[in-house]
Swiss-Prot record:
Name recorded for this polypeptide: Glyceraldehyde-3-phosphate dehydrogenase 2
Compartment(s) where it occurs, according to its Swiss-Prot or TrEMBL record: Cytoplasm
Primary residence: cytoplasm
Subunit structure: Homotetramer.
Matching Pfam families: Gp_dh_C, Gp_dh_N
Lineage of the species this protein comes from: Eukaryota, Metazoa, Chordata, Craniata, Vertebrata
Species of the source: Danio rerio
Residues that bind D-glyceraldehyde 3-phosphate: 151-153, 182, 211-212, 234
Keywords linked to the UniProt accession: Cytoplasm, Glycolysis, NAD, Oxidoreductase
């Protein structure tokens, strides 16, 4: 099998952290495209990060390329995905992290530039959606060239929902994510014609917002389709979010039973995806955590044996970026 070589389109928060995740996992990144960031600025942006700290390796530019730890990465500034020469750079897998080319039709433009497969780092309106640890076995290389890694919140919620549903059955559930603010929000009040609340100052407010993350769980766990929905509160922290899953169980279970089932999964089949803690943690304790979801055993509550509130943390930037890298490796292993 040929080596996994990756290209990244869009060098924003996720693009940069996917590069960090790939470097940590030994995945070769051969090209980056971003029409709005020149090479010199790219070096600076990758080297310094206010949330995750300075990159600990060596970063510089040489002969028109980005050099990270001695690895040369071609840099392009194409506006149109079809014009990016992925093939020339040897990047057969592309991470689409601009947030713009989300549909199969739009993301397929990368194939014209020589890419073989595309992973969209966001929910897609029509591409098959995969959550590592939950439904990656449904990936079919013969028919799927464009896939979605879902959202950071779906990646937190789905593994927990799977464990609970497999062990006790979920009759119905509501999710709330208390979510860190992101780059789409405003530093001070500004225009947001489609969703008025989203235009309010991110660090000044708790902002109710919509999210498709809970409904998307129904796409990766079909038995839960129509049984789950949810909403978000955007809060004034820069990173790390937390899911509150309140569910009615089919089969009664004590909170101790639930903890034991989650712990078993976290130390077994979902190791590295689902974490488990009994410590008295707060959000900043999870900055840089690479799990999709870390179950907080001490924060959940049970009203009775059929009605429970479960709490799970996630680094919405870094945990998610590691799953993008894991999905790339999984897909490559199926070639």
């Amino acid at each position: 099998m040929s080596e996994l070589c990756v290209g990244i389109n869009g060098f924003g928060r996720i693009g940069r952290l996917v590069l960090r995740a790939c470097l940590q996992k030994g995945i070769k990144v051969t090209a980056i495209n971003d029409p709005f960031i020149d090479l010199q600025y790219m070096v600076y942006m990758f080297k310094y990060d206010s949330t995750h700290g300075r990159y600990k390796g060596e970063v510089h530019m040489e002969d028109g390329k980005l050099i990270v730890d001695g690895q040369a990465i071609s840099v392009f500034q194409c506006m149109k995905p079809a014009e990016i020469p992925w093939g020339d750079a040897g990047a057969l897998y592309v991470v689409e992290s601009t947030g713009v080319f989300l549909s199969i039709e739009k993301a397929s433009a990368h194939i014209q530039g020589g890419a073989k497969r595309v992973v969209v780092s966001a929910p897609s309106p029509d591409a098959p959606m995969f959550v590592m640890g939950v439904n990656q076995d449904k990936y079919d290389p013969s028919s799927m060239t464009i896939v979605s890694n879902a959202s950071c919140t779906t990646n937190c919620l789905a593994p927990l929902a799977k464990v609970i549903h497999d062990n006790f059955g979920i009759e119905e559930a509501l999710m709330t994510t208390v979510h860190a603010y992101t780059a789409t929000q405003k530093t001070v009040d500004g225009p947001s014609a489609k969703a008025w609340r989203d235009g309010r100052g991110a660090h000044q407010n708790i902002i109710p917002a919509s999210t498709g993350a809970a409904k998307a769980v129904g796409k990766v766990i079909p038995e839960l389709n129509g049984k789950l929905t949810g909403m978000a509160f955007r809060v004034p922290v820069a990173d790390v979010s937390v899911v509150d899953l309140t569910c009615r169980l089919t089969r009664p279970a004590s909170y101790a039973n639930i903890k034991e089932s989650v712990k078993k999964a976290a130390h077994g089949p979902m190791k590295g995806i689902l974490g488990y803690t009994e410590d008295s943690v707060v959000s900043s304790d999870f900055v840089g955590d690479t799990h999709s979801s870390i179950f907080d055993a001490g924060a959940g509550i049970s009203l009775n044996d059929n009605f429970v509130k479960l709490i799970s943390w996630y680094d919405n930037e870094f945990g998610y970026s590691h799953r993008v890298a894991d999905l790339l490796m999984y897909m490559h292993s199926k070639e």
